[in-house]
Amino acid sequence: MSDTILSRLRAPQGVVDAVLDTDTFNEIDDQFALSYMLRSTERINTRAIYAAPFFNENSSSPEDGMLKSYEEIKTLLKLANREDLIPCAFEGSRRYLPDEKTPVDSPAARDLAARAAEYSPEHPLYVVGIGAITNVASALLLNPAIAENIVVVWLGGHSLEWPDTNEFNMMQDVAAAPGRASVSNASAESAPSSAAGTSRSGRKNHVPRAGRQSRKKSNRKFTAR
């Protein structure tokens, strides 16, 4: 790994511009991440939020998961009194990459492809992904030149000593994962989910999304204040 890439992966100083790519409706960790990011104005300037696709018991398809996440992002922005960022929230991919060379066009992918072009290797845009990395891979396929202008920090995969690679965010879109697709051309750091609470079964340890308890136990709703 070159010294240039290593230097870009070191903890930055001061305030950085960042975007968040998140399957917000899936589980509550994404809502905590977005809320924390919005409150960390001394370190992070949130430029955009992208809805990522997901498919499990909380959605009927990857597209449904993405659309539910998009609505959840807007709900959280309202609860956080950050309605000013709603125009910077974008729908993401409605399906996963069909292969490693074909992007899935979406408002999120187009925004990242255009937004990152305004940055430089010396002043990169930080791309934080905490879901399937379809949107980011698609943006890099749409505009490969942005690879040198972004630093990707992705919550996905397992640590190298883990006995398998059956991790939720990676398995959702294997073709888009770092090491397989265009994300490998960017400065990228993976935060293994095995170090962040993923069970050996490959899916995240389930926590109901913010605002309500498990439907099996109660229909009572809780509203953040």
Residues covered by each model-derived region:
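N-terminal acidic, glycine/proline-rich low-complexity segments
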Residues: 1-225
